[in-house]
Amino acid sequence: MSVPTVLQKILARKAEEVAERRARVNLAEVERLARSADAPRGFANALLERARRKEPAVIAEIKKASPSKGVLREHFVPAEIARSYEAGGAACLSVLTDVDFFQGADAYLKEARAACALPVIRKDFMIDPYQIVEARAIGADCILLIVSALDDMLMGELAATAKSVGLDVLVEVHDGAELERALKTLDTPLVGINNRNLHTFEVSLETTLDLLPEIPRDRLVVTESGILNRADVELMEVSEVYAFLVGEAFMRADDPGLELKRLFFQERGGVVLGADPD
């Protein structure tokens, strides 16, 4: 009998978690909360506007821990981090809400969004339409659909649910087969390429570069994971990839927003481009 991968363990626990959440708050109540939530802020548009100008469109992640690296940040105040990211030039935020493997929380998303004007993606493992409506109820502007965690029918159902409640969708792929499925099933403009293999948690930036030629020009590519230094950013920009999802490099920094500014907007000589100077 094979040993379950990290992703398989996460998905098994996620199914239990969704059942527990449904038992606590029924779908009708979550739908009521979703209808009364603040209007979406336009996650996809925020990224597309930057990328069209060939400026870094950074999704800055608020993540306390990960299964592979453990706790990334001891001093973890989501509102403070969100304001720091906004000042540093982020286009959007990503907030982990998975409790068991990433030490996330719904409250972190609420706190981060309330502290700034940036659109926010709920970073979690979506396997049930209930979670999509719940994402809108807690204030998310976008949800993540991970192709390796879903069959085509469920992926389409989740995307349709997202559209019905006004959420944008970032679809995430890791290889050619997943990309083919995503392009066939979904019409979202946002295609995330995760440089991390979710079964082994190994990272290679070549994943983005290898898949890039297969993606239609009308989709915006978001490179995810493994962007740690200026050379990594330049490697992507020379291939006309301008949208980035970055977490670890910022979470380990004393000032996450300052690290964002340094990594994406500061050229040699200290000149800052594209971000607010204050």
Curated annotation (Swiss-Prot):
What InterPro entries has UniProt attached to this entry? Aldolase_TIM, Indole-3-glycerol_P_synth, Indole-3-glycerol_P_synth_dom, Indole-3-GlycerolPSynthase_CS, RibuloseP-bd_barrel
Query: In this record, what's one Pfam family?
Result: IGPS
> What keywords does the record list, in alphabetical order?
Amino-acid biosynthesis, Aromatic amino acid biosynthesis, Decarboxylase, Lyase, Tryptophan biosynthesis
What does the record give as its pathway?
Answer: Amino-acid biosynthesis; L-tryptophan biosynthesis; L-tryptophan from chorismate: step 4/5
Gene Ontology annotations of biological process type: L-tryptophan biosynthetic process
Q: What is its EC number?
A: 4.1.1.48
Instruction: Look up keyword Lyase and say if it applies.
Output: yes
Q: Which Gene3D superfamilies match?
A: Aldolase class I
A molecular function (GO) held by this record is: phosphoribosylanthranilate isomerase activity
Q: Does the keyword Lyase apply?
A: yes
Reaction(s) the record says it catalyses: 1-(2-carboxyphenylamino)-1-deoxy-D-ribulose 5-phosphate + H(+) = (1S,2R)-1-C-(indol-3-yl)glycerol 3-phosphate + CO2 + H2O
UniProt similarity note? Belongs to the TrpC family.
Can you say what this protein is called?
Indole-3-glycerol phosphate synthase
Gene from which this protein is expressed: trpC
